[in-house]
Regions:
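Core structural elements
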Residues: 193-206, 310-334, 343-360, 396-399, ...
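Basic, nucleic-acid-interacting segments
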Residues: 2-300, 311, 317, 338-342
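A carboxyl-terminal module marker
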Residues: 425, 465, 469-477
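Strongly charged, low-complexity linkers/loops
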Residues: 363-373, 377, 383-457
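Extended, non-catalytic structural segments that build the interaction scaffolds
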Residues: 290-297, 304, 334-339, 372-384
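Short, basic interhelical loop/turn and adjoining N-cap
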Residues: 457-464
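Residue-level detector of well-ordered alpha-helical segments, enriched
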Residues: 319, 332, 342-350, 371, ...
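Short amphipathic alpha-helical segments and their helix-coil junctions
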Residues: 325-340, 354-358, 369-375, 428-438
């Protein structure tokens, strides 16, 4: 169900997206970043903050952060620094997080997203590097346990401008951002593994009035959760204001089971974290030559591929947008397109059928690209119907059988022989004279009924275009 404005209250949304970088080691030490390792087996005195240890910045983290900044149109700072963000929480052994406060690495970017009203430009305030905290594991028998493997895993935090006005725009922005980051190769963006997490800042106000007090919902790990959390928090704030209650600046938790948000703690301000430059880390200084060299590494990004698909293959903006929504899907499409001239049909089958069969945002396609290309060719050449193409994709999804051999073996080839189809048309007309008479008296919908009879006589294998032509000729004779 689409979101609807309540009582004239507009929402104002800003997103903070945390992306785990795909480095082999952590941001300030040599510990590995492998996902799923046994608890507390990938940490050392440096990432645990033991006295006397010194951090050493991983150059690859800066490299990847700059690539993300360049891909989102940011200005790259020639001089930036790292700061300590001080707070106490069980998953933060050092009692401070190394982040960036007033001099981030990247500033002033944007993404353009497709909305129901057309294209919309959403600003990106900044991208900065920081280290991740550990993870609390809640066990009903043992209580809350702490896994420090994630401490020191490198992150970039991508902070949007408060330009988003609907849940749908928020999800569109996240889809676009995820695609851009995947294309650069700096992260796998696997939300189910926590390598892309989203915090939502939301306030409401009436048009031409000042923005309201914002609340924050943290660590949302799916696009569906983001949309549901926004819709629910908007509803809660509107109802609270209508009751005369004040909106408190706080952090709230979204419960996926109940679909409700609940208060976690009062929201801190920057001063509460007592930021100061980390005395153990030198400033990050980048030359124009280094940045120019990294810029050359940028791959072809989604918007460029989208424009190419529209120009080269004649695809619609919608179809092209769907295909470039993931680098994996775009690569698969391009590989399949090399084996067929029926590229539009290929795109249609991917969007309507392949996407339907994918299990989750990060699922892979087991069907060989060349096999899908052959199915597109057979459909374009009217050897099989679109319905048969869909059945064939379903049947061969996890098997290596050749599509043409499968269709032949199952007797699914479409009948286009006019002599054969003419017999079905004649039989349909001869056995239903009342429909023919009704059609000729002006009940034109009866032609569709006769088409259905003839199609049934063919076992559903008749080429509908040829069958339609023959039926028209017979009825108008």
């Amino acid at each position: 169900m689409a979101w609807k404005m309540m009582d004239g209250y507009e929402m104002v949304i800003g997103l903070e997206v945390h992306v785990e970088l795909k480095t082999k080691t952590k941001i300030f030490c040599a510990c590995p970043t492998t996902f799923g390792a046994a608890p507390n087996t990938q940490c050392c005195p440096v990432c645990m903050g033991f006295p006397g240890t010194l951090p050493v910045l991983n150059r690859q983290v800066v490299h990847y952060a700059v690539l993300a900044g360049l891909a989102t149109g940011c200005t790259i700072a020639r001089y930036s620094k790292q700061d300590r963000k001080n707070y106490f929480y069980p998953d933060l052994p050092k009692a401070y997080q190394i982040s960036q406060y007033d001099l981030p690495l990247c500033v002033g970017g944007h993404l353009t997203v497709e909305t129901e009203a057309g294209e919309k430009r959403i600003g990106i305030t900044r991208i900065h590097i920081e280290e991740d905290a550990g993870k609390l594991v809640h066990d009903p028998e043992k209580g809350t346990l702490i896994d420090c493997n994630r401490c020191g895993v490198p992150l970039i935090e991508i902070v949007s401008e408060p330009d988003i006005r609907t849940p749908q725009e928020a999800v569109a922005y996240l889809h676009k951002l995820k695609a851009v980051i995947e294309y650069t190769g700096v992260s796998d963006c696997r939300m189910q593994e926590g390598s892309l997490r989203c915090d939502v800042n939301l306030s409401i106000h009436k048009k031409d009035e000042p923005f309201g007090t914002r609340t924050e919902m943290k660590n949302l790990n799916s696009f569906t959760s983001v949309q549901r959390a926004i819709e629910e928090e908007y509803r809660r704030q509107v109802e609270a204001i209508k009751k005369g209650e004040a909106i408190v600046q706080e952090t709230r938790r979204f419960d996926q089971t109940t679909g409700k948000t609940s208060s976690m703690r009062r929201k801190e301000n920057a001063n509460d974290y007592r930021y100061f430059p980390d005395p153990d880390l030198a400033p990050i200084v980048l030359s124009d030559e280094v940045i120019a060299g990294w810029r050359k590494e940028l791959p072809q990004l989604p918007d460029v591929r989208k424009a190419a698909y529209m120009a080269d293959y004649g695809l619609t903006a919608y179809a092209a947008e769907q295909l470039v929504s993931s680098k994996y899907l775009a690569d698969y499409f391009e590989t399949a397109a090399q084996s067929t001239t029926a590229v539009k049909m290929l795109a249609n089958l991917m969007i309507s059928e392949v996407f339907r069969l994918l299990d989750g945002e990060d699922a892979k396609i087991p069907l060989n690209p060349a096999a899908l290309a052959k199915i597109a060719d057979m459909t374009e050449q009217s050897l099989i119907s679109v319905g048969t193409a869909k059945k064939t994709i379903d049947a061969l999804w996890n098997t290596p059988e050749d599509p043409e051999e499968y269709v032949t073996r199952m007797g699914l080839m479409q009948i286009s022989d006019e002599a054969v189809l003419a017999e079905y048309v004649c039989k349909a007309i001869d056995t239903h004279p009342e429909m023919v008479a009704g059609y000729r008296k002006g009940k034109l919908t009866l032609k569709n009924a006769l088409m259905g009879v003839a199609m049934g006589l063919s076992g559903g294998k008749a080429n509908p275009v040829v069958l339609q032509k023959l039926m028209d000729a017979a009825l108008d004779a």
